[in-house]
Amino acid sequence: MAKEPVRVLVTGAAGQIGYALVPMIARGIMLGADQPVILHMLDIPPAAEALNGVKMELIDAAFPLLKGVVATTDAVEGCTGVNVAVMVGGFPRKEGMERKDVMSKNVSIYKSQAAALEKHAAPNCKVLVVANPANTNALILKEFAPSIPEKNISCLTRLDHNRALGQISERLSVPVSDVKNVIIWGNHSSSQYPDVNHAKVQTSSGEKPVRELVKDDAWLDGEFISTVQQRGAAIIKARKLSSALSAASSACDHIRDWVLGTPEGTFVSMGVYSDGSYSVPSGLIYSFPVTCRNGDWSIVQGLPIDEVSRKKMDLTAEELKEEKDLAYSCLS
């Protein structure tokens, strides 16, 4: 029996990340090689023509799994009946802009998109926020879509997680698929804490801790962390454009693991609503190590946290509290 198509919304679909993401979804990379999809692409009116061009290309690519394309600038049409929503659209910070100006633009975008999703998305729609500030945009969306369960609203830190895996893989000259269980704690910003204390590498003699194999704590506690934290900026410097291919790929990884489950013994990083685990204040969307099964994520419990890690985890939580306060001040 062929599966029923899943409706996937991509906002900001005419942009760089959208252009990288929609073919991945249409090829089955996000939801599996046997899962038909109907793509809903939403963008702002000035991007309508470009959006239509992307729709033409999707049709021209003749993807067997793609059962329909909705390209629209109307939020109601874009959100109607969607099972998965990937929120890529947002207002990027431009030179000379104050943080508060950017925040207030994004607060109004996410407030209105929350309302459209709440009214028109399919029940149990899973939402992934990619646009920056991702954690706080997701928090605003949660506030203004109270009927969407909080466990269904997440933000993307899988890009940071994958960047951390990539750095370890390069350092040890091993395939990235042999590295697992790095953790990104906190905000998707340069205050995030990439933690390798629980990470493992598959070797010919079984799994070994990353620290044991790298044998260079100064690198792991210094350059490794700053490289992962600053990677987005490094890519902008090199490409003159922000990372799109890697962001799109990690968004697919995030949704795929969430819907289809994480491999046994592996955890991944997701920005989710804090329940107070690891003494992270509740009321924030914070990146935690999670496992997924049957379409639900759970925070990995009981990992030992040393004093150095604790400080870094608290620091990024502080930044998230500040962002939250700033966002709420834009609402009043």
UniProtKB/Swiss-Prot annotation:
Chain positions recorded as oxaloacetate binding sites = R99, N132, R163, H188, S243
One GO MF term attached to the UniProt entry: L-malate dehydrogenase (NAD+) activity
Q: Supply the gene name.
A: MDH1
Could you tell me in which tissues this protein is expressed? Expressed in rosette leaves.
What compartments host this protein?
Cytoplasm
Question: According to the UniProt record, what class of enzyme is this?
Answer: oxidoreductase
Q: Please give the activity regulation comment for this entry.
A: Decreased activity upon treatment with hydrogen peroxide.
Q: Which Pfam families match?
A: Ldh_1_C (PF02866), Ldh_1_N (PF00056)
Q: Is the keyword DNA repair assigned to this protein?
A: no
Its quaternary organisation is: Forms a homodimer. Forms a disulfide-linked homodimer upon oxidation. Interacts with 14-3-3-like proteins GRF1 GRF3 and GRF8. Interacts with TRX1, TRX2, TRX3, TRX4 and TRX5.
- Could you tell me the EC number(s) of this protein? 1.1.1.37
* Similarity remark: Belongs to the LDH/MDH superfamily. MDH type 2 family.
Q: Which residues form a coiled coil?
A: none
Which UniProt keywords are listed? Cytoplasm, Disulfide bond, Isopeptide bond, NAD, Oxidation, Oxidoreductase, Tricarboxylic acid cycle, Ubl conjugation
Q: Under the cellular component aspect of Gene Ontology, which terms does the record hold? A: apoplast; chloroplast; chloroplast stroma; cytosol; extracellular region; nucleus; plant-type vacuole; plasma membrane
Residues recorded with modification Methionine sulfoxide:
M56, M97
Which reaction(s) are listed as its catalytic activity? (S)-malate + NAD(+) = oxaloacetate + NADH + H(+)
Q: Identify the catalytic residues.
A: H188 (proton acceptor)
Q: Which Gene3D superfamilies does the record cross-reference, listed alphabetically?
A: Lactate dehydrogenase/glycoside hydrolase, family 4, C-terminal, NAD(P)-binding Rossmann-like Domain
Q: Name the chain's protein.
A: Malate dehydrogenase 1, cytoplasmic
Write out the GO biological process terms: malate metabolic process; response to zinc ion; tricarboxylic acid cycle
- Record's function text: Catalyzes a reversible NAD-dependent dehydrogenase reaction involved in central metabolism and redox homeostasis between organellar compartments.
Q: Where is this cross-link: Glycyl lysine isopeptide (Lys-Gly) (interchain with G-Cter in ubiquitin)?
A: K119
Residues the entry annotates as binding NAD(+): Q16, I17, D43, G90, Q113, N132
This protein's superkingdom? Eukaryota
Q: Cite the InterPro entries for this sequence.
A: L-lactate/malate_DH (IPR001557), Lactate/malate_DH_C (IPR022383), Lactate/malate_DH_N (IPR001236), Lactate_DH/Glyco_Ohase_4_C (IPR015955), Malate_DH_AS (IPR001252), Malate_DH_NAD-dep_euk (IPR011274), Malate_DH_type2 (IPR010945), NAD(P)-bd_dom_sf (IPR036291)
